[in-house]
Regions:
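ABC ATP-binding cassette signature C-motif
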Residues: 1-95, 149-383
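Flexible nucleotide-interacting loop at or near the entrance of a catalytic core
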Residues: 86-177
Length: 383
């Protein structure tokens, strides 16, 4: 659907192209194509996006809507972020100096206003005091959740062994003889346009789906927590958020569980909302709360950034980078993949895979990977 809408918007070479979250539901390859297209697009583009890498690649100007106003910046996302943070810091520092000066003047006035010999100086300082105006720093509309995954148990050397897994769905071989071993320091990104293959692999590893052939084995020191791509069944209940989360906590205390919810921006009575009434972003934050509460040393994420705002994506990204355990994840956000993964597994359309210990950017630039893709494409054409 997204690709069809993009094709409609791009048809006819418009003078102004308006794009509202164009990268939603696009895989990384499609996003890369869109980036290159927009970079070369000669007319005006106005885009709303939560994808930081995409904004850095495409945008030459940023319109920041915050503090009840719109502020324009020349530059890409990173330049805007650094500039906006610098402006706030400078305002706070300037206000601090003004407050110190105000205190100094008030103390002088209070001390010498009744002293005849100092009355002129006191009056002069009163005038100076009246001229000092503090800059109004309005509260930001941006709220950052606190995401910190802390495993309760250190992971051992034997993490996961996958041997010869195959799976056919609706007559299509989604996974074909997949084998890999996961080490204790791996953060593996599942990439490629074969979305069904990635989700099927996650479901098998989470015990939700049986492979047609092959096997897998988790190490005895591992504990797994899984973020599913489709959470419809999970939230099809009238159970309260706090009650649902408590079942995953060793500490069966509502106050303890509410602490996790508070970090994830569920304030006050939000914790007693029913599961089924939550928005897309709230559902994601509840699932991330569950993963934090469980304290697992292996995290599996299947597209966790869907429905999240930029602040939550940034917080999740930082939490994944800091996590001392193993991560297996699929994600449409280039920056999350690049900054988190130290190993790439690409699932190809024919059900096979490419496995490489590298960062995502290095993987994309690799001649070896380009040759492997070319061989695969030639084989497909021959078939």
């Amino acid at each position: 659907k997204v690709k069809v809408l993009l094709a409609q918007a791009l048809f006819g070479n418009p003078d102004i192209l308006l794009l509202d979250e164009p990268t939603n539901h696009l895989d990384l390859d499609a996003i890369s194509w869109l980036e290159e297209f927009l970079i070369n697009f000669e007319n005006t583009v106005i885009v709303v996006s939560h994808d930081r890498y995409f904004l850095n690649k495409v945008c030459t100007n940023i319109a920041d809507i915050d503090y009840g106003k719109i502020q324009l910046y020349a530059g890409n996302y990173d330049f805007w972020y650094e500039s906006s943070q610098l402006i706030v810091r400078q305002m706070k520092e300037a206000n601090k100096k003004k407050e110190e000066k105000i205190k100094e003047l008030q103390e002088f006035i209070q001390r010498f206003s009744a002293n005849a010999s100092k009355s002129k100086q006191a009056t002069s300082r009163k005038r100076a005091l009246e001229k000092i105006q503090l800059d109004e720093i309005r509260p930001s509309s941006r709220k950052y959740p606190y995401i910190d995954f802390r495993p309760e148990r250190e992971i051992g050397n034997d993490v996961l062994f996958v041997e010869g897994i195959s799976k056919t769905i609706d007559g299509v071989k989604v996974l074909d003889n997949i084998s890999f071993t996961v080490n204790h320091d791996d953060k593996i990104a599942f990439v490629g346009g074969n979305e069904l293959a990635k989700t099927t692999m996650f479901k098998i590893l989470a015990g939700e789906l049986e492979p047609d052939e092959g096997s897998y084995k988790w190490g005895v020191t591992t504990s797994q927590s899984y973020f599913p791509k489709d959470n419809t069944a999970i939230f099809d209940t009238d159970e309260l958020i706090v009650d649902w989360l408590t079942q995953y906590s060793e500490i069966k205390d509502a106050t303890y569980v509410r602490g996790f919810l508070g970090r994830m921006l569920f304030a006050g009575e939000d914790g007693v909302k029913k599961m089924r009434v939550l928005s897309g972003g709230e559902k994601v934050r509840v699932l991330l709360s569950r993963m934090m509460i469980m304290g697992s040393n292996v995290l599996m994420f299947d597209e966790p950034t869907d429905h999240l705002d930029m602040e939550s994506i940034t917080a999740l990204n930082n939490g994944m980078i800091k996590f001392p355990g193993v991560i297996l994840f699929a994600c449409r956000d280039h920056q999350v993949v690049q900054t988190t993964a130290n190993r790439i597994i690409e699932f190809l359309p024919n059900g096979s895979m490419i496995d490489k210990i590298t960062t995502y950017d290095e993987y994309l630039a690799s001649d070896e990977m380009a040759k492997k893709r070319h061989v695969y494409q030639m084989n497909e054409e021959d078939n």
